[in-house]
Amino acid sequence: MRQWYCGLLLLVMTTPSAAQTIRRSFQTTDGMMLSFLEAGSEHRNNPTIVLMPGWLMPGRIWQRQLSDFSRSYHTLALDPRGQGESQVPSSGYTAERRATDLHEFLLQRSNILLIGWSLGGIEALQYVYMFGTARLAALVLVDSSVGEEPAAGSSGRFKDDFRRDRDKTLRQFVRAIFAKPPPEKEIAELVRGATRMPVEASLALLDYPFERSHWRNIVRRFEKPLLYVVTPQYEEQAANLKKNRPATEVELFKKAGHALFVDEPQRFDALIKKFAARLS
């Protein structure tokens, strides 16, 4: 596959010990330019940390983690197709294509600690299903359903509201993912970015045509270290995964919102660094 990377300085972190964050891009095999953020450099024996955002969110939602992790780890945050600064194509909004995008992004890398939040966790599992675990050191799933019981509630009404008034529904959605809402300017920026993707493409990401057992089987069979970080909405799924896959590490954030790594960054970052240290 032909790939090229073009970088420009995005920003310089104000903390002296933090690395610069660079925005780069690469071209997929179907011709799409996907953007990502990169911070830090490779450290001997340390895994490369790759961060996957959730539904319609940009990679920069991990900005605190990029700054923190890059002190010791090469850290990357991908903008999936149609999200963040990546190209918005007319097609490719399927689990298979987006897992392929991730595969192509990781081709030049190894010893990866892959962290997927929400939809990013589902797509990380699809990557494992399609391409295996040879490049992975471990996997972290952040507040994502894994197909265990109980099932999440129906999203039918949300989809109807989204079609009827996308901007209003997105504003409500973005506010709801935080227990401690950020300033309105930041919410507006996240909403504005989320509207880049066409309505039906956005909703297609919520309707991957797989039985819940598909995800359950992937995660139960995952043979490398696995950390499942959840809020109370997935507490029962986490307990059942622990029962069915005892090696799974589980951490519950009782007071955080869905974007728990934004609400409680110090606790989340310490948890990930402790987990990553055991992989070195």
Question: What positions do the PLM features span?
Answer:
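Catalytic histidine-centered segment of alpha/beta-hydrolase-like enzymes
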Residues: 256-269
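Active-site loop/oxyanion-hole signature of alpha/beta-hydrolase fold enzymes
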Residues: 29, 37, 67, 77-115, ...
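Conserved alpha/beta-hydrolase "nucleophile elbow" surrounding the catalytic nucleophile
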Residues: 53-55, 116-121
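Flexible "cap/lid" loop of the alpha/beta hydrolase fold
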Residues: 125-166
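Conserved HGGG/HGGXW glycine-rich cap/lid loop of the alpha/beta-hydrolase fold
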Residues: 32-87
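N-terminal cap/lid segment of alpha/beta-hydrolase-fold proteins
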Residues: 19-33
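Conserved alpha/beta-hydrolase catalytic His-Asp/Glu region
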Residues: 149-153, 164-221
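Conserved serine/cysteine hydrolase catalytic core
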Residues: 199-252
